[in-house]
Amino acid sequence: MTTLHNLSYGNTPLHNERPEIASSQIVNQTLGQFRGESVQIVSGTLQSIADMAEEVTFVFSERKELSLDKRKLSDSQARVSDVEEQVNQYLSKVPELEQKQNVSELLSLLSNSPNISLSQLKAYLEGKSEEPSEQFKMLCGLRDALKGRPELAHLSHLVEQALVSMAEEQGETIVLGARITPEAYRESQSGVNPLQPLRDTYRDAVMGYQGIYAIWSDLQKRFPNGDIDSVILFLQKALSADLQSQQSGSGREKLGIVISDLQKLKEFGSVSDQVKGFWQFFSEGKTNGVRPF
């Protein structure tokens, strides 16, 4: 064992103030110098330092995971708030539709189904309305009605899940449906063109336009007894407003193509009506002896 010399008392050896450490306890020691004196670090100390380092690493890793989870939750809540704000902005312009959303009745029915699943809740909403923006609006109403109802905490949690799911998976679909609702509702008041097909046609034109033939086929299917010319005019006005709100980008170019195709369809529809009228004129024998062939 190294003898430490005290500068104040000459070379007198220092007396040991504690028993000698057994040789088995000082195995794998690390030697070094500290301020001119020999020091020893027992392997147990090294292990303690390693254990502390490992624990600190684990704690920081755990905090990082929690931070990511909180960030994801925060992003989801922000998305729900953004969609909700736009839905309220547009649907509030059509109070007639809001009156149909009897949240109290909906809450009463759902509170009697304690084991309802997320998919069942969505299916129930689809049964109340086929329009995603109205479904989302109903969920927001349910969420607000459930505040301060701890006995329905399971349902409140389910509604929050549904809101996050819809906002993330159908956000654009919901917002576009809400945005066009005031104009589509006014157009539907004539009793000729139904509200939901108007919303769906506009939404398809913005989100997934497939070309002039596809949109013509959709118009024929969705408005078999409607006034297709007025539907085309409705779409032209709505898309032109969207075009003016966009300064640049691929979205603006796509809207320009759709509007151009709609104009062609309008002209084609006019010619088609003339041909039908011409054919009916001949088939009824109103041609002074000239008969249809």
UniProtKB/Swiss-Prot annotation:
Any GO BP: protein secretion by the type III secretion system
GO CC term, one of those recorded: cell surface
Topology term for the membrane: Peripheral membrane protein
Gene3D superfamilies listed in its UniProt record: 1.10.150.630, 6.10.250.670
Pfam families: HrpJ
InterPro entries in the record: HrpJ-like, T3SS_LcrE
Keywords: Calcium, Cell outer membrane, Membrane, Plasmid, Virulence
Matches recorded under SUPFAM superfamilies: Type III secretion system domain
Top-level taxon in the UniProt lineage: Bacteria
General function of this protein: Plays a major role in regulation of the low-calcium response. Seems to sense the calcium concentration and to transmit a signal to shut off yop transcription when the calcium concentration is high.
Family annotation (NCBIfam families): LcrE
Sequence similarity: Belongs to the HrpJ/YopN family.
Protein name in UniProt: Outer membrane protein YopN
Native species: Yersinia pestis
High-level lineage: Bacteria, Pseudomonadati, Pseudomonadota, Gammaproteobacteria, Enterobacterales
Gene label: yopN
